[in-house]
From Swiss-Prot:
Domain of life according to the entry: Bacteria
Origin species: Magnetococcus marinus (strain ATCC BAA-1437 / JCM 17883 / MC-1)
Record's keyword annotation contains Cell membrane: no
GO biological process: keto-3-deoxy-D-manno-octulosonic acid biosynthetic process
GO annotation, cellular component aspect: cytoplasm
Record-given protein name: 2-dehydro-3-deoxyphosphooctonate aldolase
HAMAP family: KDO8P_synth (MF_00056)
Keywords: Cytoplasm, Lipopolysaccharide biosynthesis, Transferase
Compartmental location: Cytoplasm
Pathway(s): Carbohydrate biosynthesis; 3-deoxy-D-manno-octulosonate biosynthesis; 3-deoxy-D-manno-octulosonate from D-ribulose 5-phosphate: step 2/3; Bacterial outer membrane biogenesis; lipopolysaccharide biosynthesis
Catalysed conversion reaction: D-arabinose 5-phosphate + phosphoenolpyruvate + H2O = 3-deoxy-alpha-D-manno-2-octulosonate-8-phosphate + phosphate
NCBIfam families associated with the record: KDO8P_synth (TIGR01362), PRK05198.1 (NF003543)
Main location: cytoplasm
Length: 287
């Protein structure tokens, strides 16, 4: 199928286009922290020459324990994301967890994201798509990649075809995820842009007892492999000090490691997209 181009503010996503980065800390930790991390990420991406969509969550509704840090909540979180968008000048994405959040969130952000655990919930997926903003639909850790075409069809039935499909690992026994890179190519057959979540793919759900663990040593390896297969973008949660982050620290990438990794990913992406262009007859960057 001909690859689609999805525009998020001024940023274009397409499996045939230069890769885009979706990045930011797991959860909103306050206004100043959000502005500071967004500005730092913007400068890194501008230096490398990669487009950025800033990501952070106002609520982590699927934490391992009742007492786990969840974030500032929707109202306060959206105010912060609006400030980031306006003052830093980057498009923003955040996740929704309930159908009745979608309209309010879509009024502030440039793209919505749906959690992997909820990808089979038809009413929820359609509620996320109905406002018309682009939606990054995460594939469930239990779902075959070919099944994501039907998930996308549910969203598109609302009239919104601004859909991206995101791989974030597959459950492999208890408290472990693996990535089958074939799934990226299988999902790309839908025509929708495919995003690879390099940090949640190294998560170890519930492995720390009251919290999820992870192994960030493998983030770079998986990101390079995914880009070599060919994706529209890479999703990475990035933090200046992940060992002291309130959630998902073990699988977040230290911000100091981002620039050299992006240099590598950009080079790999260029090689892969040039090959794809030759195979399809498109010029790199064509819509």
């Amino acid at each position: 199928m001909t690859p689609r181009t999805i525009t998020v503010d001024t940023v274009r996503f397409g499996n045939h286009l230069p890769m885009t980065l979706i990045a930011g800390p797991c959860v909103i930790e306050g206004l100043e922290f959000a502005l500071r991390t967004a500005e730092a990420l913007k400068q890194i991406c501008e230096g490398v020459g990669v487009e950025l969509v800033y990501k952070s969550s106002f609520d982590k509704a699927n934490r391992t324990s009742e007492g786990s840090f969840r974030g500032p909540g929707m109202e306060a979180g959206l105010r912060i994301l609006e400030r980031v968008r306006r003052e830093v000048g980057v498009p923003v994405i955040t996740d929704v967890h309930e159908a009745d959040q979608c309209v309010a969130v879509a009024e502030v952000v440039d793209m919505l994201q749906t959690p992997a655990f909820l990808c089979r919930q038809t009413d929820f997926i359609q509620a996320a798509a109905r406002p018309g903003k682009p939606v990054n639909i995460k594939k469930g850790q239990f779902l075959a990649p070919q099944d994501m075409a039907r998930v996308a069809a549910k969203a598109a039935a609302t009239g919104n075809e601004n859909i991206l499909l995101c791989e974030r690992g597959f459950s492999f026994g208890y408290q472990n995820l693996v990535v089958d890179m074939r799934g990226l190519s299988i999902m790309a057959q839908s025509g929708y842009p495919v995003i690879f979540d390099a940090t949640h793919s190294v998560q170890q759900p519930g492995a720390l007892g009251g919290a999820s663990g992870g192994d960030r040593r493998f983030v770079s390896d998986l990101a390079r492999a995914a880009v070599a297969v060919g994706v529209a973008g890479v999703f990475m949660e990035v933090h200046p000090d992940p060992d002291h982050a309130p959630c998902d620290g073990p699988n977040m990438l230290p911000m100091a490691h981002l620039s050299p990794l992006l240099d590598q990913l950009k080079a790999l992406d260029r090689i892969r997209k040039e090959a794809m262009a030759l195979e399809s007859g498109l010029s790199l960057g064509d819509a």
